[in-house]
């Protein structure tokens, strides 16, 4: 045997020529090692999907969700809690997938008619699996005061995953990872990444949804904000301190997120109470990303005032008629920002940036990653600019991991390589927090 690279350079294409659907398919398959997908169910659903008809995607995954839920109910009736757990996890995962391609608008009335129902179903199915997981899981609520004249308080839903006695660290104290979501994920999907990898390593992991995300968007209509970290340390801290009888180490708190969640993690890392940050494939500047493939001449005419927003809207909407992915992307951003105009959506992107020295405020160790096969972010324009702006940190506490091949973590958000991503992330956190693990010979 040789150590040379195998004679392939890409990943299997479930839908040849459709990068978007291929990526979303691998995203679902990525949860298989941790209970979110079954190989035969996955392949059966894929075979039923016509890439030119988005409704077949919804129908295929809805069917698999119903099948998995039925299996879970049958297992539960017989006292087989392992099969019940697995069935409920898969049903929740497939339900999320079933609604993923629905087109939404800027107001709750303009969301897809099934959007809220699907969000609630994802949550309820997932919660039915919680009592049977191999860790303690507490459903928590984090208070958030809406930035409006009414100052209304909304309770943000979260899950706190705690390691069982078998996985506790020798010193008895439990380090904490705050795991943020991104633009289109839900926290039930986050379980398959850092939470399942954290509790088995002795970490507590807190996931939560904030403005513009998941059920918070669908139920309360709260829109995303660039300073997302204002969801509040006070709320996280009080939630963690309420865990009576559990010795959470509030001097060892880290934050992690992927894609847009990586941007949020970097913003949150400026808080001195955050002792480490893992930013998985974040963007550096959303405006640069959103306008990269638009003609420079056209951009100059628009930003220079020679053409107005109405012209930009017309051109983008013309493209939306024939390009489903563009139509879906505009719908997603319209929903989480509450903006109908494509031109105004692009302008909103300019608020989501780490330019201007923001990262100089970050004083904790940071691991930032990039993805050579990213569907969205160029590594030089995003990953390396983040890394360069962290130049004030000690070299040993400013790390970059930028794999290129899919099996090495080269897809956006480390899709298809969650296990490897956790090995890198928790290895870095162990080092920062001084956690030494006993080496075991095979």
From Swiss-Prot:
GO terms for biological process: melanin biosynthetic process. This is Hydrolase phmG. Hydrolyase; part of the gene cluster that mediates the biosynthesis of the mycotoxins phomacins, leucine-derived cytochalasans with potent actin polymerization-inhibitory activities and monocot-specific antigerminative activities. The first step in the pathway is catalyzed by the hybrid PKS-NRPS phmA, assisted by the enoyl reductase phmE, that are responsible for fusion of the leucine precursor and the polyketide backbone to produce a 2-pyrrolidone intermediate. The active site is at residue 259. SUPFAM superfamilies: alpha/beta-Hydrolases (SSF53474). Keywords: Hydrolase, Virulence. The gene is phmG. Its EC number is 3.7.1.-. Pathway: Mycotoxin biosynthesis. It holds the Pfam family Abhydrolase_6. It is an enzyme of class 3 (hydrolase). The keyword Transferase does not apply. InterPro entries: AB_hydrolase_1, AB_hydrolase_fold, FrsA_esterase. Homodimer. It comes from Phaeosphaeria nodorum (strain SN15 / ATCC MYA-4574 / FGSC 10173). GO terms for molecular function: hydrolase activity. It comes from the Eukaryota. The keyword Hydrolase applies. Belongs to the AB hydrolase superfamily. FUS2 hydrolase family.
């Amino acid at each position: 045997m040789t150590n040379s690279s195998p004679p392939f350079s890409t990943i299997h294409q479930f839908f040849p020529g459709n990068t978007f659907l291929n990526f979303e398919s691998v995203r679902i398959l990525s949860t298989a090692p941790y209970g979110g997908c079954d190989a035969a169910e996955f392949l059966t659903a894929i075979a039923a999907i016509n890439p030119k008809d988005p409704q077949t995607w919804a129908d295929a995954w809805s069917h698999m969700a119903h099948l998995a839920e039925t299996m879970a109910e049958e297992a539960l009736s017989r006292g087989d809690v392992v099969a019940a757990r697995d069935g409920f996890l898969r049903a929740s995962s497939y339900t999320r997938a079933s609604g993923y391609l629905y087109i939404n608008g800027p107001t709750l009335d303009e969301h897809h008619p099934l959007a809220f129902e699907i969000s609630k179903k994802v949550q309820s199915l997932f919660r039915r699996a919680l009592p049977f997981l191999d860790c303690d899981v507490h459903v928590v609520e984090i208070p958030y005061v809406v930035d409006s004249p009414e100052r209304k308080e909304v309770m943000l839903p979260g899950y706190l995953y705690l390691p069982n006695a078998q996985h506790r660290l020798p010193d008895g104290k439990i380090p904490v990872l705050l795991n943020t979501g991104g633009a289109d994920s839900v926290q039930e999907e986050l379980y398959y990444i850092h939470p399942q990898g954290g509790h088995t390593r002795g970490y507590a992991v807190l996931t939560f949804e904030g403005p513009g995300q998941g059920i918070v968007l669908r139920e309360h209509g709260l829109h995303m904000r660039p300073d997302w970290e204002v969801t509040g340390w006070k709320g996280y801290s009080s939630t963690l301190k309420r865990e009576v009888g559990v010795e959470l180490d509030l001097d060892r708190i880290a934050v992690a997120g992927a894609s847009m969640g990586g941007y949020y993690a970097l913003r949150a890392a400026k808080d001195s109470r955050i002792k480490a940050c893992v930013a998985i494939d974040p963007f550096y500047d959303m405006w640069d990303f959103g306008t990269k493939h638009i003609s420079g001449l056209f951009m100059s005419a628009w930003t220079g005032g020679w053409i107005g927003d109405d012209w930009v809207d017309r051109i983008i909407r013309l493209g939306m008629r024939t390009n489903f992915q563009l139509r879906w992307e505009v719908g997603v951003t319209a929903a989480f920002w509450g903006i109908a105009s494509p031109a105004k959506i692009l302008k909103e992107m300019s608020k989501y940036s780490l330019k201007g020295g923001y990262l100089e405020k970050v004083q904790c160790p940071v691991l930032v990653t990039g993805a050579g096969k990213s569907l969205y972010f160029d590594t030089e324009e995003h990953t390396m600019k983040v890394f360069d702006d962290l130049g004030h940190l000690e070299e040993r506490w400013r790390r970059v991991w930028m794999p290129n091949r899919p099996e090495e973590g080269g897809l956006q958000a480390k899709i298809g390589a969650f296990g490897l991503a956790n090995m890198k992330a928790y290895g870095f956190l162990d080092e920062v927090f001084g956690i030494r693990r006993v080496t075991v010979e095979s």
